[in-house]
């Protein structure tokens, strides 16, 4: 396993650990999710380029589209929660139920 794969895998693990440890604020959770998506994108792109898989070359782009949709939904939820309650605590999200 090359150093590039190890570094990208460590970036994914660090983002996952950040998501598990710092989950009290919604903004920190969203940043950790974006770090995970970015490391997955880079890992997929490098693996596809190294293995010369031309049929799977659209897979990282599709992952980026899903990451952009996730970021937009997360930021809109962050704005709604912070405008309603004045804080971005994740514990306020269970108050949004009907």
From Swiss-Prot:
Q: Which GO terms describe its cellular component?
A: mitochondrial inner membrane; respiratory chain complex I
How this chain sits in the membrane, per its record, is:
Multi-pass membrane protein
| Disulfide-bond pairs as recorded | none
Q: Name the gene.
A: MT-ND4L
Please state what the protein is called.
NADH-ubiquinone oxidoreductase chain 4L
Protein's UniProt keywords contain Transmembrane: yes
Answer whether the UniProt record assigns the keyword Transport to this protein.
yes
Q: Which reaction does it catalyse?
A: a ubiquinone + NADH + 5 H(+)(in) = a ubiquinol + NAD(+) + 4 H(+)(out)
The subcellular location is:
Mitochondrion inner membrane
């Amino acid at each position: 396993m090359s150093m590039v794969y190890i570094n990208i895998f460590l970036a994914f693990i660090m983002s996952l650990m950040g998501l598990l440890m710092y989950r009290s604020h919604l903004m920190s959770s969203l940043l950790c999710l974006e770090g995970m998506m970015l490391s997955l994108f880079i890992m997929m792109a490098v693996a596809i380029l190294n293995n010369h898989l031309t049929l799977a070359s659209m897979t990282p782009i599709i992952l980026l589209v899903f990451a952009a949709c996730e970021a937009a939904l997360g930021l809109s939820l962050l704005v709604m929660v912070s405008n309603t309650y004045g804080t971005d605590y994740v514990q306020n999200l269970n108050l949004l139920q009907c």
